[in-house]
Curated annotation (Swiss-Prot):
Residues 313-333, 514-534 dip into the membrane without crossing it. The keyword Phosphoprotein applies. This is Autophagy-related protein 9. Phospholipid scramblase involved in autophagy and cytoplasm to vacuole transport (Cvt) vesicle formation. Cycles between the preautophagosomal structure/phagophore assembly site (PAS) and the cytoplasmic vesicle pool and supplies membrane for the growing autophagosome. Lipid scramblase activity plays a key role in preautophagosomal structure/phagophore assembly by distributing the phospholipids that arrive through atg2 from the cytoplasmic to the luminal leaflet of the bilayer, thereby driving autophagosomal membrane expansion. Required for mitophagy. The chain crosses the membrane at residues 170-192, 216-236, 411-431, 447-467. Phosphorylated by atg1. Atg1 phosphorylation is required for preautophagosome elongation. Keywords: Autophagy, Cytoplasmic vesicle, Endoplasmic reticulum, Golgi apparatus, Lipid transport, Membrane, Phosphoprotein, Transmembrane, Transmembrane helix, Transport. It is a multi-pass membrane protein. It catalyses: a 1,2-diacyl-sn-glycero-3-phosphocholine(in) = a 1,2-diacyl-sn-glycero-3-phosphocholine(out); a 1,2-diacyl-sn-glycero-3-phospho-L-serine(in) = a 1,2-diacyl-sn-glycero-3-phospho-L-serine(out); a 1,2-diacyl-sn-glycero-3-phosphoethanolamine(in) = a 1,2-diacyl-sn-glycero-3-phosphoethanolamine(out); a 1,2-diacyl-sn-glycero-3-phospho-(1D-myo-inositol-3-phosphate)(in) = a 1,2-diacyl-sn-glycero-3-phospho-(1D-myo-inositol-3-phosphate)(out). Residues 59-166, 711-787 are annotated as: Disordered.
């Protein structure tokens, strides 16, 4: 057996090729693929077929071949490698006998092909990126080839940049432990007053005189420190692989790693993916079937974010839906939620690790850990979230300062005046005669310099509590600026941004640092009570949550259903408005299968803000200029002022109509808590270069519907509905509005208002289809075909229609009719 094993390694393989094995495996597994028959599979090819056909993909690839375009990965290769790759690709696959045995070679040999396989595959064009995988035996490539890439590339600072902070943390930890041990056990504080040097107060052999508890704690800290060192040593190989992946495959140098954006990294990952036929998206249907087993390697910005934030998306949904009971089981603190870093670590240990396996100033404020999880959106990486939240701190501080307590300000002003006057007199006297006055004792053993420091500190503290005289009292505007960055706008805040109730609720999320620090200290005492008494009450809801909101995506595994954005249709659905708010709120299914305060829709727009457009362009999150609102024209919709909050333009409109934050709950069922949209025109999101065709936002925005579809766990994998005819409106022409006579089959007259948004053009049984009598195939109902112009315009003719327009313009009334 030993000899046969050695001979099998030395002799070339005579079996079937790799492609033949893949083809045979796919043919055998077509009828028995468990994931294809599973109800939770999210089929990307269904959405992909809606946008591109195989013929279009083949024609695009043929055009690129005729034009002689090089492989996208050539930009990441050195000139020598690129030239050798071109020669190897032009000459076609060749049978090369390995010079050395396999166990003596550092790289994997190139697989040998049988001549029949070459004739069957008809694929002689080998991309240049594949020529890097051990196909050259010269010493140059052997030294330049990187190790197999690691999947831990979420942090855009690999290798040396990643090792430096960890080394500094280990050194800092060692200094803190050693310095604390020295201060607590090696100094005799009773001799400090009578001694003149440090040697007189030091305790010799202090470690041998330590107590048993101190010695045990010191040994534990030393073992922890040694474990951190071993962990860093073991991670050096992984960090080296990460460095090689960035340097050789992505073309990111060590100097560029500090300034490159994450969007640019994702763009280069997609370029590298397209250079590999196993992961390229623009392939024919035949080749896609052959490479079907490699679907796990296909990725874009959405797939990468879902992989990196698999656990975080679940925790975001748990916090958003108020599944976790975080109240203190204490009589006088039952309504207060405690969520510290220690409790977060315990929740990850008890819930997340069980579900998943391993395959400043004294008065300054900051957001609490609970507020961070409320503000964070699905598929939002930590460095992007941290950047967004840090931009909101100046506006949050200004909003909190908008509510000064008058009595506190008066007392602080009086104290600042007294302390400032005394400090000014002492400072002036010290300047006039410093030698005499600085040594002068105002009280026993208290000189002028001591009181100068005390009064100066009191003046600075009291002066900081007094607001500036130039501060404009406008809390509503200040909070709207905060919402621009936090994207947190509960529905019950609407119309109450100036109230003290909203201020108190926001102050719970934005507390002083000293209070957050005290909560972290007290959480070591209260965390066991929450884990023992409060969280067990919601254990059934936690289990139901993971069962109901988990879907299986082909190639990525199990994900949170809210994080799997359906960029075409299905999950993000906006109704047209025949379900009023009261009926929607009374439906418990809508509340259960939905996110609160439009969390999923806000995450969708936030994801497009981060990954939309050109990653090499300027910051996509830069606040755009919004011109002042215009007066309602003849073609204005009837809900002009519906989006005003306190007689202001909603700033969330800047995020491509994120007035959905005020819509209530965005549902996985296909309905929101507020039935009517009525918040202005919704523009279609722009396509992104970092998303595949199946993840691109549709041209008409979200699909519109006026009913609640039954929820099922197979909803994401269902085939798309039949197309519905939509009216084409010219943007350069004003919309014509007139009262339409109802069809004879309707019981009562009803005016179908034009929503003026892309959501109004929908599919299914929408009111657009009913009012115009359209069927799914674009046919016109017979009973509406005989309707003449006089019935539409009321028998007045063209002149009468013009008179109606003039009357509407004169009375300054909004239109209320459908376009002809």
């Amino acid at each position: 057996m030993m000899a046969s094993n050695v001979l099998s390694r030395l002799l070339p393989q005579t079996g079937q090729s790799v492609y033949e094995t893949i083809r045979q495996h796919d043919n055998d597994s077509d009828a028995s693929d468990v994931e294809e028959r599973a109800g939770l599979v999210y089929d990307d090819d269904v959405n992909l077929g809606n946008r591109f056909s195989d013929r279009e993909l083949e024609e695009a690839m043929a055009d690129a071949t005729r034009e002689g375009s090089s492989s996208p990965s050539d930009t990441f290769l050195t000139p020598q490698i690129a030239q050798r790759g071109e020669r190897s690709a032009s000459s076609g696959p060749r049978m090369r006998k390995p010079n050395n045995p396999r166990f003596m070679r550092s790289v994997t040999p190139r697989p040998e092909f049988v001549e029949d396989d070459l004739d069957d595959d008809h694929d002689d064009d080998v991309p240049a990126s594949l020529l890097m995988e051990g196909q050259h035996d010269d010493e140059y490539l052997r030294t330049r080839l990187p190790p197999p890439p690691s999947h831990h590339f979420s942090d855009p600072q690999p290798s040396r940049s990643a090792r430096s902070p960890r080394r500094e943390h280990i050194r800092t930890f060692a200094f803190v432990v050693g310095f604390t041990t020295f201060l607590t056990n090696c100094i005799d504080y009773r001799l400090v007053r009578t001694s003149k040097s440090l040697d007189q107060i030091l305790i010799s052999k202090c470690t041998s005189r330590m107590s048993a508890s101190s010695t045990f704690l010191l040994w534990l800290l030393c073992l922890f420190w040694i474990g951190k060192i071993f962990q860093l040593i073991l991670d050096i190989r992984r960090l080296k692989n990460m460095h090689d992946f960035y340097h050789y495959l992505l073309g990111v140098s060590d100097a560029e790693i500090q300034t490159i954006s994450w969007q640019e990294v994702v763009s280069r990952l997609m370029t590298l993916r397209d250079a590999n036929p196993a992961t390229a998206g623009a392939v024919s249907a035949f080749n896609r079937r052959l490479l079907g087993s490699q679907s796990k390697q296909r990725m874009d910005a959405h797939d990468i974010a879902n992989r990196l934030m698999r656990k975080e998306n679940y925790l975001i949904a748990l916090i958003n839906k108020d599944i976790l009971d975080l109240t203190l089981p204490i009589p006088f603190l039952r309504n207060r939620q405690l969520f510290s870093r220690i409790l977060e670590w315990n929740i990850n240990l008890c819930i997340m690790d069980y579900v998943f396996n391993e395959q400043g100033q004294l008065s300054s404020r900051q957001y609490t850990p609970l507020a961070e999880w409320k503000f964070r959106e699905f598929n939002e990486l930590w460095h992007l979230f941290e950047k967004r939240i840090n931009l909101s701190y100046p506006y949050a501080t200004r909003y909190v300062d908008q509510f000064p307590k008058d009595k506190t300000v008066q007392v602080a002003g009086f104290v600042a005046f007294i302390s400032g006057a005394l400090a000014s007199v002492l400072a002036l006297a010290s300047i006039l005669d410093p030698e005499l006055f600085l040594g002068f004792e105002l009280t026993h053993d208290r000189t002028t310099l001591f009181y100068l420091g005390v009064f100066g500190s009191v003046w600075a503290f009291a002066r900081g509590m007094v607001p500036e005289e130039t501060l404009v009292f406008d809390p509503e505007y200040a909070l709207l600026e905060v919402i621009q960055f936090t994207h947190y706008f509960p529905s019950h805040w609407k119309g109450k941004l100036h109230s003290d109730d909203v201020r108190r609720e926001f102050a719970v999320l934005y507390q002083m640092k000293i209070i957050i620090f005290m909560e972290e200290i007290l959480s070591m005492i209260f965390t066991p009570f929450i884990l023992w008494f409060s969280l067990p009450k919601c254990s059934e809801r936690v289990i139901d949550f993971f069962r109901e909101f988990t879907v299986h995506v082909d190639g990525m595994g199990y994900l949170c259903s809210f994080a799997v954005f359906d960029f075409k249709k299905g999950t993000n659905v906006i109704p047209q408005g025949h379900i009023n708010q009261r009926d929607a709120r009374q439906d418990p299914r809508v509340d259960y299968f939905s996110t609160k305060d439009g969390k999923m829709l806000a995450s969708y727009y936030g994801f497009l803000d981060n990954y939309g457009g050109n990653p090499r362009a300027t910051n996509a999150n830069k606040r755009a200029f919004h011109p002042p609102p215009t007066f309602p024209s003849l073609g204005s919709p009837p809900f002009v002022g519906a989006s005003n909050i306190g007689n202001r333009q909603d700033p969330i409109q800047a995020r491509v109509n994120t007035a959905s934050a005020a819509l209530g709950q965005q549902s996985m069922l296909g309905a929101t808590r507020l039935g009517a949209l009525g918040v202005g025109d919704t523009q279609s999101p722009a396509p992104s270069l970092l998303l595949d065709p199946q993840h691109q936002p549709s041209a008409s925005g979200f699909r519109a519907t006026n009913h609640i579809a039954p929820h099922h766990r197979q909803r994401l994998g269902r085939p798309p509905p039949a197309p519905v005819s939509e009216s084409i409106i010219d943007d350069n022409e004003p919309s014509i509005a007139a009262a339409r006579r109802p069809a004879p089959r309707r019981k009562s007259g009803q005016l179908h208002t034009n929503s003026g948004s892309s959501e109004a053009l929908g599919a299914g049984d929408s009111n657009v289809e009913d009012s115009w009598g359209m069927k799914s195939g674009g046919e016109v109902n017979d009973e509406d075909a005989e309707e003449n112009v006089d019935d539409v315009v009321g028998g007045a003719g063209v002149l009468g229609l013009i008179q109606q327009f003039q009357k509407v313009n004169k009375d300054n009334r909004p239109r209320a009719a459908v376009g002809l």
